[in-house]
Regions:
Chain B
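Membrane-cytosol interface at the C-terminal ends of specific transmembrane alpha-helices
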Residues: 84-124, 137, 149-150, 210
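Periplasmic/extracellular loop-to-transmembrane helix junction in inner-membrane transport proteins
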Residues: 1-20, 35-41, 77-82, 185-191
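Transmembrane-helix boundary motif in ABC transporter permease subunits
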Residues: 17-48, 61, 111-113, 119, ...
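C-terminal transmembrane helix and the adjacent membrane-cytosol boundary/short C-terminal tail
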Residues: 109-125, 137, 191, 195-228
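Non-cytoplasmic
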Residues: 68-69, 146-184
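Interhelical loop and adjacent transmembrane-helix boundary motif
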Residues: 1-6, 166-206, 210
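Membrane-interfacial helix termini and adjacent extracytoplasmic/periplasmic loops
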Residues: 60-97, 168-171
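Transmembrane alpha-helices
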Residues: 20, 105-108, 116, 130-163
Length: 221, 228
């Protein structure tokens, strides 16, 4: 469950986000420079909002009023970067294992690299380096790496924009499946309205930092 | 006169010790300067780079002042270790380290700044603390620059003359490094000794520059995040 209402001053406009999401996929759609990535970064703790509150699963991770600002590493948020940000000095397996919680710290699920790699169909790549795999494969590795931390919220910044049409359609389907399996809220940034329609249970349109429309859809699974 | 290889050994000792000091000090300082903003940062940056542009005699003079018998650090050394710095090999090491520091610092700082910040951010979202981010992401990806800095610092230490002469003097077998031995052999008309040392230094310097150039053109590790 995510509840966030915050503002962030940017050089040319002020961004305002008001998001409430319990499960499913929220698609943030808008042109380049609308502030979509800034919203994700504020939620993750990579940027600090100028005002507002962010609550994840009832836990207050940011509050300008109370001076709360929980460090990124304690927010339990998975983040998939636009360019995947895979560590080039590590194999696929080491990338995926990088964020695995220490034993005992998260008792609810038993996650091993093997089953995350299998779920995303990348077991055969475990000993390769990021520069030896394709764009679609990189995307799966980035997803696996983020899920390995057992996040309570997954943020995806234009995860499919650099992929060809075929890979893109396949991965869209897989994202839907993954969300249904994982049962945590996903926020997905995209500049493609069609993709937003296809993936979003909820769509927020953003233009120059203002939320222009919120639509709740009931997707037929 | 018979050829003496002792200056070569002394030079190697000095350069090695100086490089160790420079490596240990420049990496944390460069990381701090690349990553943190603080008041007066430009002044600190200028002071760090100063030995690169100051004449060696000025550096030598300053070192004599600081490490001399009545200098603040000279006195401390005398008190703690019952030893002096001036006219010892330690003085030569300090002189070499001071002139080599900015070269290493610049190389490391640029290398750290060039590491894709998204990779460091990604590591943080994966639960890593700052030290882990630094040792598992930043440092390995800046390795090319660090190695280049080490080689340059070693070469510069080996070639240090002016400041070394002022603080360590010219004591054959004790502080007489290669560049100093060349100068005094030439002054004394011993061109044989001077020529051999000149050839060794030139060949070595050539190999360093050639090696760095070749390495720079070689297959570099991709420091970007595997983007398409």
């Amino acid at each position: 469950m995510l509840k966030a209402h915050f503002k962030k001053k940017l050089p040319t406009f002020e961004l305002e986000a008001d998001i409430s999401l319990s499960n499913g996929i929220l698609a943030l759609v808008g042109p380049s420079g609308a502030g979509k990535t800034t919203i994700l970064q504020c939620l993750a703790g990579l940027q600090t909002p100028s005002w507002g509150e962010i609550n994840i699963h009832g836990k207050n991770v940011f509050s300008s009023q109370h001076g709360t600002d929980v460090p990124i590493r304690n927010r339990r948020i998975g983040y998939v970067f636009q360019d995947y940000a895979l560590f080039p000095n590590m194999t696929v397996e080491k990338n995926v294992m990088y964020g695995k919680p220490k034993k005992g710290s998260v008792p609810n699920k038993v996650l091993t690299a093997a089953n995350v790699l299998e779920m995303l169909k990348i077991e055969h790549l475990r000993n390769r380096y990021p520069n030896q795999i394709s764009g679609g494969e990189k995307q799966r590795v980035a997803l696996a790496r983020a899920l390995m931390t057992e996040p309570e919220l997954l943020l995806l910044d234009e995860p499919l924009s650099a992929l060809d049409q075929d890979t893109r359609s396949t991965l869209q389907q897989e994202l839907l499946k993954l969300q249904a399996q994982w049962q945590i809220p996903f926020i997905l940034v995209t500049h493609d309205p069609q993709e937003a329609e296809m993936l979003g249970d909820q769509i927020i349109k953003l233009d120059r930092g203002k939320q222009e429309g919120i639509r709740k859809l009931h997707r037929v699974q | 006169m018979e050829f003496s290889y002792i200056p070569i050994i002394l030079s190697l000792k000095v350069a090695l010790a100086a490089v160790i000091i420079v490596a240990c000090s420049s990496i944390p300082i460069a990381a701090l300067m690349a990553k943190r903003e603080f008041w007066g940062k430009d002044v600190v940056e200028s002071i760090i780079t100063l030995p690169l542009v100051l004449p060696p005699s000025v550096i030598g003079f300053m070192l004599l002042y600081v490490f001399g018998k009545n200098g603040p650090l000279g006195k401390l050394f005398e008190l703690w270790f019952h030893t002096r710095i001036v006219f010892t090999l330690a003085g030569a090491v300090i002189a070499a380290a001071v002139v080599a520091f900015p070269l290493m610092y610049q190389a490391v700082k640029v290398a750290i700044e060039n590491v894709d910040q998204n990779l460091e951010k990604a590591a943080r979202t994966l639960g890593a603390r700052e030290l882990r981010v630094f040792f598992t992401i930043t440092l390995p990806l800046a390795l090319n620059g660090i190695v280049a800095g080490l080689v340059l610092a070693f070469a510069r230490s080996l070639g240090e003359f002016g400041a070394t002469l002022m603080i360590a003097g010219n004591i054959p077998g004790k502080t007489q490094t290669m560049p100093i031995a060349i100068y005094f052999a030439n002054e004394a008309g011993d061109t044989g000794q001077a020529s051999i040392l000149v050839i060794i230094m030139t060949v070595f310097s050539f190999l360093v520059i050639y090696g760095l150039n070749r390495w720079g053109k070689g297959p570099r590790r991709d420091t970007r995040g595997g983007g398409a």
